[in-house]
Design a protein with these regions (language model features):
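Protruding loop/beta-arch "assembly-hinge" segments enriched in small, turn-prone residues
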Residues: 5, 22-30, 309-354
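Classical Sec-dependent N-terminal signal peptides that target proteins to the secretory pathway
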Residues: 7-16
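Assembly/oligomerization interface modules of large self-assembling protein complexes
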Residues: 23-116
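Extended oligomerization regions of viral-like shell subunits
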Residues: 62-63, 165, 170-317, 323
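Short loop/turn segments at secondary-structure transitions that flank enzyme active sites
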Residues: 73-78, 115-117, 124, 146, ...
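Short helix/loop capping segments that flank catalytic or ligand/cofactor-binding pockets
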Residues: 77-82, 128, 218-221, 283, ...
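Alpha-helical scaffold segments that mediate packing/assembly in large oligomeric complexes
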Residues: 97-99, 104-108, 113-198, 252, ...
């Protein structure tokens, strides 16, 4: 009797640390579905689906959740030893040299988690001849690219610790112009006080443009004129046959490429073109992609909270993928614009009435 009670006592003591009963399919059972080399492939190919990553500067991978970036905030000043009308003399040769200073402030890369969930019918999993990964991979890439781009451009679902979105920060610095503000699209973009000039006046050189798809038509409508003032029919913002006669045309603005994301990340009600010194934007990845297979979960719409999938009831599984990444625009001081509130390396071409 005492021996049975003792065994019961031991079981009660050990119960909290005994492994819980697993109601999900462990990772080992789906290794064929997500080979290790594909995890690296995702990280390598996400930039292809993200215009921010394509144009921005990729910093080294982060080893911690936060990385400090020292950013120059005060510039040194040089002084003449013998200024003004004073004639050089023995006394002036012994004059004290003036002091100057430099200063740095810290900006931070804060890595936040980005998740993608792909729901898959179990019937598809049972089909061993079906190349499931070939179907999942492009959708994962697309989802990562859209989410990151919209967070950077517009602050959509962005973590609170991340910097202000590009559009918000550019407008706060006065770096925006609306369609038709100068009376002519050419002047809006390239004229005095136009889109590109706003960035240049802040001490940065524009090296790329991210545009809404509708701007392609507007660009095609701007055509060169001949000596008689008549339009020749040649689009002035297209560099024809950039890669030879068989190559595709490339849209350029002031000699720098314009890209038109097809992933739906650009909201034309907020920006028609985002022009900037893109290497001033840096991003970094905290860790590679991780995976988990969900078998009996309920998937909800994050906005409406309505149930999108009931995996157990609908004979489905869901593959959840996660990665952690960060971005920042250090916006260092320069000689042309020393006021940080007025300085920003991006400008926004906004729709009329915005």
């Amino acid at each position: 009797m005492l021996k049975k009670l003792w065994k019961l006592f031991i079981c009660i003591l050990l119960f909290p640390i005994l492994p819980a009963f697993k109601t999900y399919v462990p990772r080992s059972s789906v290794e064929a579905l997500m080979p290790e080399e594909y995890q690296k492939e995702i990280v390598e190919h996400v930039p292809e689906m993200s215009s921010v990553m394509k144009l921005g500067y990729k910093a080294p991978n982060m080893s911690r959740a936060q990385k400090r970036i020292p950013c120059l905030s005060a510039l040194p000043t040089a002084y003449f030893s013998n200024p003004g009308p004073t004639v050089r003399s023995d006394a002036s040769d012994k004059r004290h040299k003036q002091l100057t200073t430099m200063a740095w402030e810290n900006k931070y890369l804060d890595a936040e988690e980005l998740n993608v969930i792909v729901a898959i019918p179990e019937a598809v999993l049972d089909d061993t001849d079906y190349d499931l990964w070939a179907e999942i991979k492009p959708k994962l890439l697309e989802a990562y690219g859209i989410a990151f781009d919209q967070a950077v451009y517009y602050g959509t679902n962005a973590p609170a610790i991340w910097p202000d979105s590009i559009v918000a920060a550019a407008m706060a610095a006065g770096n925006y112009i609306t369609l038709g503000e100068k009376g002519d699209l050419y002047d809006d973009l390239l004229g005095d006080g136009g889109l590109i000039a706003l960035v240049e006046e802040d001490g940065f050189m524009v090296d790329g443009h991210v545009s809404a798809m509708g701007m392609r038509g507007k660009m095609r409508g701007l055509r060169a004129t001949g000596a008689d003032g008549e339009k020749t029919g040649t689009p002035i913002f297209k560099s024809l046959y950039k890669e030879g006669m068989q190559g595709s045309t490339r849209y350029e603005l002031d000699g720098e490429e314009m890209i038109f994301p097809k992933n739906g990340s650009i909201d034309p009600t907020q920006s028609l073109i985002i022009a900037g010194a893109w290497k001033q934007l840096m991003y970094a990845i905290r860790k590679d992609v991780s995976w988990k297979l969900l078998t009996e979960a309920v998937i909800q719409d994050p906005v409406t909270k309505e149930i999108t999938y009931n995996l157990a009831q609908q004979n489905m599984v869901a593959l959840r993928s996660s990665m952690r990444l960060a971005w920042q625009v250090p916006n260092p001081i320069n000689r042309l614009q020393t006021d940080e509130d007025e300085r920003y390396p991006f400008a926004v071409f906004a729709p009329a009435g915005s």
